[in-house]
Amino acid sequence: MRLLIAAVGKAKAGPEQDLFRQYCRRLSPPPVLKEVEEKRPLAGPQLKAREAELLLATLPEGAKVVALDEKGRDIGSVDFAHRLRDWRDSGCQDVAFLIGGADGHGDAVRERADLLLSFGRMTWPHMLVRALLAEQLWRAHSILTGHPYHRP
């Protein structure tokens, strides 16, 4: 199953980017990262709608979509791994994870998402969310393959 991470904004060099890459390299094949950015000076609802368009344009046809959202479901690592396993076992070829901009996701992303996922009620910096997601993808892989990285 191929994994795509589509994110608003360009990653800057730093420890968050290093951590993201470290976890992605552990996965085979590693997730593909697509970064989108709106250059025009839009604000509020217009910006969210435009960022949603840009994110949705990155999706492979038929992909399952997970939107990272502070109002999403807060699930454990094992449940997350099982969700990915179930999609894989049902023949899903692509899963796309969408990370919105500073104002969150536009309605179009929320409507398209198969899962709205939260990493808790706290607000996280977008670059750190990438690293958290990559770690959880590695952890899910570890859970599903019996690798000792994840200890229940």
Curated annotation (Swiss-Prot):
Superkingdom of the organism of origin: Bacteria
Binding sites annotated in the UniProt record for S-adenosyl-L-methionine: 68, 100, 119-124
UniProt-recorded Gene Ontology molecular function terms: rRNA (pseudouridine-N3-)-methyltransferase activity
Pfam family, any one: SPOUT_MTase
Any GO CC annotation of this UniProt entry: cytoplasm
Compartmental location: Cytoplasm
Function per UniProt: Specifically methylates the pseudouridine at position 1915 (m3Psi1915) in 23S rRNA.
The family this protein is said to belong to: Belongs to the RNA methyltransferase RlmH family.
HAMAP family: 23SrRNA_methyltr_H
Subunit text: Homodimer.
Name of the protein in question: Ribosomal RNA large subunit methyltransferase H
